[in-house]
Amino acid sequence: AATTLRRGGGREPTPPATPPTHARPDPTRRHPDPESRAPPHARPRSPPPPAPSPPPLPPRPAAVRAGRDRVGRVFSRLPPGCAAGSCYPATGDLLVGRAPRLSASSTCGLRRPQPYCIVSHLQEEKKCFICDSRRPYDARSNTDSHRIENVLTTFAPRPKKAWWQAENGVEHVSIQLDLEAEFHFTHLIMTFKTFRPA
């Protein structure tokens, strides 16, 4: 043990040195978070709160849904390229295959043979002819038939020999064609056998 000198020549014993104490961690004491000691600019930023979701849309009315469904079905049936812009379908002869749907208010020779005269043949030897439309036109056996179906374009030999003709003296004659559907009508070609009617 260390001693200290006193004034009388005697020595005063020094108290024994206490051994150093080691601090033990206190489990009940909360230690500061190391991130809390970091400077403000070094602390990680917490993610922003999520944005509130928009309110749900009201259900579409049944009529609107049905209308849009019908439009979608129509566009799905269109040929390619029609839904993006104007559509020009292929043109064709609307009379082909529709002979039963074609009718005329007057046709010569349906009940009995009837005579008729062609004005353009006045200077020729034969000016008047017989119309017998009781049977359909045939290039070999019945060339005097002039039913309304003769106006159809066919690939029969000598097609210009067949035509439709109304009765003599009948006015306000009309031709009717039932197409059974809607079409985009572009043009009509009519070829007259004689002079055009006034």
Swiss-Prot record:
GO cellular component, one term: basement membrane
Positions with biased composition (Basic and acidic residues): 23-38
Keyword NADP part of the UniProt annotation: no
UniProt domain Laminin N-terminal: residue ranges: 83-198
Alphabetical GO biological process terms: cell adhesion
Superkingdom in the source lineage: Eukaryota
Record's subunit section: Laminin is a complex glycoprotein, consisting of three different polypeptide chains (alpha, beta, gamma), which are bound to each other by disulfide bonds into a cross-shaped molecule comprising one long and three short arms with globules at each end.
General function of this protein: Binding to cells via a high affinity receptor, laminin is thought to mediate the attachment, migration and organization of cells into tissues during embryonic development by interacting with other extracellular matrix components.
The protein's name: Laminin subunit beta-1 variant
Organism in which the protein naturally occurs: Gallus gallus (Chicken)
Lineage, uppermost ranks: Eukaryota, Metazoa, Chordata, Craniata, Vertebrata
